């Protein structure tokens, strides 16, 4: 079940979220626990002329265990391993909800999460400026000013996560995206942990990114 084209949603598939409707444009990639798509949606913005609707690109992550799941039409199937699938699906849904509550300029913004097609989706900000790893390679390193700027931005994002009882356990340049204005955005919470009120960590499933994994 590893061939992404056999099991991914097709171009122009419509997904109905809680607040938005999404049209699948293309596949961005696939990891062990999900398929990430580029999609279009309408959002309302306020300006001098009042409230207007505009079309934006978003990334949508679909919970899909490539070693377990299949697909009939758009519906995700799980065969005889439904127990395993539904356990992980429940975790994925809870963690998507937690991520949707985060609001920080240097953490990828989750618009909403929702259930459809026997699985869970969440829509997030699409950051298309490339990742920090690629930027470092292209520039043959960072300047001192850039190093200080990115360290501060990501440090602020991590402090915000910690204040919300979340840990990011896969911090690396490949999981830091750059907006077109060169601001850093922390993505890929696949190895994050959520702490409960008693301070006990619960290991996550693979969730929360604008990248395939």
Question: In which residue ranges do the predicted regions lie?
Answer:
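Activation segment signature within eukaryotic-like protein kinase domains
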Residues: 150-151
């Amino acid at each position: 079940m590893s061939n992404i084209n056999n099991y991914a949603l097709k171009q122009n598939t419509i997904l109905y979220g809680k607040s938005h409707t999404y049209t699948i444009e293309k596949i961005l990639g696939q990891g062990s626990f999900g398929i990430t798509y580029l999609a279009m949606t309408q959002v309302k913005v306020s300006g001098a002329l009042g409230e207007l609707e505009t079309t934006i690109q978003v990334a949508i992550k679909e919970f899909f265990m490539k070693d377990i799941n299949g697909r009939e039409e758009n519906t995700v199937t799980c065969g005889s391993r439904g127990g395993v699938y539904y356990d992980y699906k429940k975790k994925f849904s809870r963690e998507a909800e937690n991520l949707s509550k985060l609001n920080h300029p240097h953490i990828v913004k989750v618009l909403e999460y929702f259930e459809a097609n026997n699985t869970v989706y969440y829509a997030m900000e699409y950051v298309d400026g490339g990742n920090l790893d690629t930027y470092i390679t292209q520039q043959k390193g960072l300047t001192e000013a850039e190093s200080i700027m990115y360290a501060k931005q990501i440090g602020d994002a991590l402090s915000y996560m910690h204040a919300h009882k979340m840990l990011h356990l896969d911090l690396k340049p490949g999981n830091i995206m750059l907006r077109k204005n060169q601001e850093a955005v922390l993505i890929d919470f696949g190895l994050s942990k959520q702490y409960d009120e008693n301070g006990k960590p619960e290991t996550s499933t693979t969730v929360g990114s604008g990248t395939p994994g």
